[in-house]
Regions:
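Catalytic-core regions of core metabolic enzymes
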Residues: 1-477
Length: 477
């Protein structure tokens, strides 16, 4: 039904514009929002015509600045606007006359303010769009990021396309999520920051992502919905076809108040959302940090549903804390059998090593070859479903750091030969030097095709959420 309505083709065209007008772009302030969109399009090397528009005219990066949309030669597909709210309807009419399919309004100051005058202005904007046949994204949002079409609202985003589609009511949360996920090896097919949703809304974009062959995972950050019945129907359909990860904002009294002033949404009862997600097998992290952890897990361990874990890392106390964290989340740590223990003793001295799972290799770092053999043996152990390694730069003395880095490289090589799922924890550090080491090691993990987490608790929770999701998915078949 969706394909026959033509809406898929319309939205697909919006994600792949052939020409863009940047209405309200400034030549003097490089930090102005429309300038950010302009700079991002240039950084991403958008291939179609780009038209900067500002009543003052002039030149920007060698491009003529047009004084109005009407001055643009030929037609445009898409417009990005940061003009004042009061002239937004006029801009829509000008864009319609130029053949635009959609206009994105970054502009705030509409219905989210609660002011009656600007609420009426938003209604006028919707009416004008309806009259002219143009679709509106926003207002009060960042718009669209589609690396395939070289369209972005942040020049720090990855230029590489991926398989995650993300719908976010918040522009800031969308930027945070994309940036953090990119560093974790997660790339996106499409990202939509839709703000007030005066026209196109969460249901429209969700329906598109369900159909989109480039999207394998769907993520959402929502503060409220416009049509609960339609959204629920789409959510149920989406959850049967693709993994869905949903963070709901505005859960408490204060959050609900912030929601109403942020995007003009009604937050809704959080217990209703919890029940809905359980019924439809939707993964519901508590916050954006957890969402990124879950997306990294789904990206690199999509079918993960293990319970028995092998934990490996340097430090007895850290190993104890990590074991506690995983057991609290329902994972099991099978004890190393006597037979395997005897084989391990052939590679490694028992003193200082916890050869009972978790494995503390801190006393074996001076003999990385033997340690490599020991880890390879353990990863073949039939009682283990998956392996988790960890590294804590802040607990190491300066003299041990280089040795630990070499040992960690050896561990990752041993894990790389395993056919079992492997995850890695690289904890953040306070000092710049140690944080740089942590970042370097985390990027090695990502390059090897494994999920990386920044804390024991984050890893255990994300793995739990994905394991439970996959088990429920099987029961729904």
């Amino acid at each position: 039904v969706f394909l026959l309505t033509g809406k898929y083709d319309l939205l697909d065209a919006i994600f792949h514009p052939k020409s863009i007008a940047f209405v309200g772009v400034t030549t003097s302030n490089p930090f102005h929002w429309t300038r950010t969109f302009w700079d991002s399009a240039r950084e991403f090397q958008f291939e179609g015509p780009m038209y900067p528009v500002n009543p003052r005219g002039g030149e920007l990066n060698g491009y003529k600045v047009y004084r109005s949309v009407e001055e643009i030669p030929g037609n445009i597909d898409y417009a990005i606007c940061t003009v004042s709210a009061k002239i937004a309807p006029e801009i829509v009419r000008e864009c319609a006359a130029k053949g635009a399919r959609a206009v994105h309004f970054c502009t705030a100051g509409f219905a989210e303010t609660g002011n009656a005058d600007v609420t009426e202005l938003q209604q006028e904007l919707v009416a004008t769009a309806s009259e002219t046949g143009i679709r509106i994204i926003g207002p009060n949002c960042m718009g669209i990021y589609c690396p395939e079409s070289r369209l972005s609202y942040d020049n720090g985003f990855s230029k590489q396309s991926g398989n995650v589609g993300f719908i976010s009511q918040s522009g800031g949360n969308s930027i945070y999520t994309v940036r953090e996920a990119n560093w974790r090896g997660v790339k996106f097919s499409k990202v939509i920051s839709f703000g007030n949703a005066c026209d196109l809304n969460e249901s429209d974009f969700l329906e598109y992502l369900i159909e989109d062959p480039k999207t394998r995972i769907i993520a959402l950050y929502l503060e409220g919905v416009r049509d609960g019945k339609r959204f629920r129907q789409l959510l149920e359909r989406a959850s049967r076809e693709k993994p869905v990860v949903l963070v709901k904002g505005g859960c408490g009294e204060g959050g609900a108040r912030a929601t109403s002033t942020h995007t003009g949404s009604l937050a809704g009862n959080n217990s209703v959302w919890d029940t809905l997600c359980r019924q439809l097998n939707i993964i519901k992290p508590k916050n954006m940090e957890e969402m990124v952890d879950v997306l990294a897990t789904l990206q690199f361990m999509p079918d993960f549903k293990g319970r028995n874990v092998l934990l490996v890392g340097p430090g007895g106390g850290a190993s104890v804390m990590l074991a506690d964290e995983f057991e609290r989340k329902g994972f099991k740590l099978p004890a190393v059998t006597d037979k395997i223990r005897e084989e391990l003793l052939g590679f490694s001295q028992a003193a200082g090593n916890m050869l009972l799972n978790p494995i503390d290799y801190s006393q074996s770092m001076q003999d990385p070859g033997s340690m490599h053999k020991a880890i390879q043996l353990l990863t073949k152990w039939k009682e283990v479903d998956f392996c988790v390694g960890f590294f804590r730069p802040s607990q190491m003395t300066d003299g041990f750091l280089d040795m630990v880095r070499q040992a960690d490289d050896m561990i990752q090589q041993a894990f790389g030969a395993s056919f079992k799922p492997v995850a890695y924890i690289v904890e953040s550090a306070v000092t710049a030097t140690r944080q740089a080491i942590a970042f370097e090691m985390a990027q090695k993990v990502v390059a090897s095709g494994k999920p990386v987490y920044y804390s024991f608790a984050a890893a255990a929770e994300a793995l739990r959420l994905v394991a439970e999701y996959n088990k429920r998915k099987i029961s729904r078949l």
